[in-house]
Each structure stands twice: as structure tokens, then as C-alpha cells.
């Protein structure tokens, strides 16, 4: 029923749109959700069944915007359904981490940033974007926290921590895994000196993190998201046994402490072509991060690294500089000196 058909005085502001506004009365027929089926099912489940949550009883009173389409033919309805779903904007990686209740890595990532129990304050993590500009006032991104959680748990070699992203882990396994990753994160933030101010989260945090990330900073790499992921991967690799029968040469705490001796400036020659492109930008791809992590593990271990792992580092480092050491052994570039 159009608003213009009512025998009531309509304000002048609405009169010109009277044919486009009105009331919809549905009498009979069948309602089919062309889009939002999961949301509809979730609302129905909360309304029909007792649900935990302070506001579950109020859901039945919520107002939801809906677009109604008249079914003219199966062909037209099917076409609309296909178009809506085919061109739907996919959720971002950050959104998936924020909302997933099945992915154990995502659940633990959020716990690391909780107000009461977390290691990181919400304000120091960018929840929306996967990258940080030099002017960003965040320390890292939720995507990088997620990736480090995966690295830590997979590196633990504990079978119960090898989560299937589509199946929610047992509460007990989540608790144990959280204790494990939160301890490593706490060690990183306390033992890696450039990170100490992040936990303090003082009133001057924004200025400090921008200064630390600037290309001129002595520690600029440690504040670039891709390099942060590579850093954690490299430290964890250095803490793995060098052979099947060996004990690790370093504990995670020792590795973080030793990392303070590494030169972390983006302008330092050791990172050129490894994770820093010729343009000066970060190479955030998988190969760049892998090269950086290998080089970090070498600098932390030095000659304590097994020969086969050192060969892998030598190959990756030289390939970054356009040298194939198997075909041109005489052109091999020496690895940067390991820390002492």
C-alpha cells in the first residue's frame, strides 16, 4: 500500500516520494531466503532454543532490514540468487579471525588480545588491515598474531595443537595451547629489548611505535608485519634440534635474548634482496619471509647449525642475490657473520 494512497495528511517532505514508500502486508505464500540463510538460521536458533548470553532473550525484539522480491519465475529468482552469491564480497582474513568459533588458532589469537587475560592491549593491534604504514600507531596486525600462533603451535610438535581450522578444539586443549603461546609471546615482548615499550602501552606509545618503524630506525624491521612473522619463524627454527637425536641448541628465551645482537635496520646490507627489495620496500611474499627466517636462524645458531640446514640457508641467501651456488660455486656470497 503506497503512502500516497492513504487518506491522511502526509508531511510535505514525504509527499514527493509517496509512490515509493508504504506498507507491505504478506498474506500466505512461501518465504525463501535468497541470501543470508546462515544469519536467518542463527536468529531462529537463538529465538527458538535457550541460548547462553546476556542478551539472547532480547534477540526476538531486534529489527532487521530485509529486501523482499516478488517471485515471477524460477528463472528470474535463480538468476538473482546466483548473482547475489557469485559477486558477494568475501570476508577478509581479519574478519575471519575475529569471528571464527571453530578455528583454534583464531580463538587463541583473540585471547592474546583480551583485556583481562591477554598479552597485548587491543589498542596496539590493527584489527582491520594486514599491513601497517610508517604512520600507523599500531604495533602489529591481527593477521600476524594469528600466523605467529600457528607457527608456535606447529613448532611445538604437540599433536593436540595441530588444529583443524573447521573443527573447534576441546576446551582443555585450547587452554593448554593458550598457556604455551602466551608464554612465548610474553618472552618475546620482555626479552627483545625494542619491544619492551609495547607492553607498557604508555601515553607516548603512538610516537614511540612510529619512530621505531621509520626506515631510519635501528630496529625498523622488527616493526614491519611481514618481518615480524619471519622473525618468529626464524627464532623457532633456531630452537629446533639440529638432528633427530640432538637436544635443541637454544631455548626460546635464549634465542630471543640473542636476537638483540642482530642488526635490525631496514637499511642494513644483510637484509638487502633477502626481505628488502631494491626499491627499499618490504618483500612480504612467502619467499621473502622464508629467506629472512632462514637467515635469522643462521645468525642465532652459527656453526651449531647442522650442515644440511646451513646449506639451505646458503642456497636461499645466494638465490636472493641471483646466484645459483650449485652451478656457480665460485660466485657464492658468504653468509653474514653469526652473532657471538
Segments from the language model and where they lie:
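Accessory terminal alpha-helical modules
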Residues: 1-340
Amino acid at each position: 500500500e503506497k503512502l500516497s494512497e492513504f487518506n491522511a495528511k502526509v508531511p510535505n517532505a514525504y509527499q514527493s516520494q509517496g509512490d515509493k514508500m508504504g506498507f507491505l502486508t504478506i498474506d500466505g505464500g512461501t518465504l525463501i531466503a535468497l541470501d543470508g540463510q546462515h544469519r536467518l538460521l542463527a536468529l531462529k536458533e537463538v529465538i527458538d532454543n535457550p541460548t547462553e548470553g546476556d542478551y539472547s532473550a532480547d534477540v526476538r525484539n531486534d529489527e532487521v532490514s530485509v529486501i523482499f522480491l516478488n517471485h515471477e519465475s524460477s528463472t528470474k529468482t535463480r538468476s538473482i540468487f546466483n548473482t547475489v552469491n557469485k559477486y558477494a564480497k568475501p570476508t577478509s582474513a581479519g574478519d575471519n579471525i575475529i569471528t571464527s568459533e571453530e578455528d583454534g588458532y583464531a580463538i587463541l589469537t583473540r585471547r592474546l588480545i583480551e583485556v583481562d587475560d591477554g598479552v597485548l592491549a587491543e589498542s596496539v593491534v590493527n584489527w582491520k588491515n594486514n599491513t601497517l604504514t610508517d604512520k600507523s600507531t599500531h604495533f602489529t596486525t591481527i593477521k600476524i598474531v594469528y600466523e605467529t600462533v600457528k607457527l608456535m603451535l606447529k613448532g611445538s610438535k604437540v599433536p593436540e595443537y595441530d588444529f583443524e581450522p573447521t573443527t573447534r578444539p576441546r576446551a582443555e586443549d585450547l587452554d593448554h595451547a593458550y598457556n604455551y603461546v602466551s608464554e612465548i609471546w610474553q618472552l618475546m615482548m620482555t626479552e627483545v629489548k625494542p619491544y619492551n615499550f609495547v607492553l607498557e602501552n604508555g601515553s607516548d606509545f603512538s610516537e614511540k611505535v612510529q619512530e621505531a618503524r621509520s626506515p631510519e630506525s635501528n630496529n625498523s624491521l622488527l616493526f614491519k608485519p611481514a618481518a615480524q612473522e619471519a622473525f618468529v619463524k626464524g627464532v623457532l627454527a633456531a630452537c629446533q634440534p639440529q638432528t633427530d637425536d640432538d637436544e635443541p641448541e637454544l631455548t626460546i628465551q635464549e634465542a630471543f635474548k640473542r636476537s638483540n645482537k642482530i642488526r635490525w635496520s631496514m637499511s642494513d646490507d644483510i637484509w638487502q634482496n633477502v626481505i628488502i627489495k631494491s626499491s627499499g620496500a618490504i618483500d612480504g611474499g612467502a619467499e621473502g619471509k622464508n629467506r629472512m627466517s632462514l637467515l635469522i636462524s643462521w645468525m642465532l645458531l652459527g656453526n651449531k647449525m647442522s650442515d644440511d640446514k646451513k646449506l639451505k640457508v646458503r642456497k636461499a641467501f645466494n638465490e636472493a642475490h641471483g646466484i645459483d651456488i650449485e652451478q656457480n660455486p665460485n660466485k657464492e656470497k658468504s653468509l653474514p657473520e653469526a652473532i657471538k
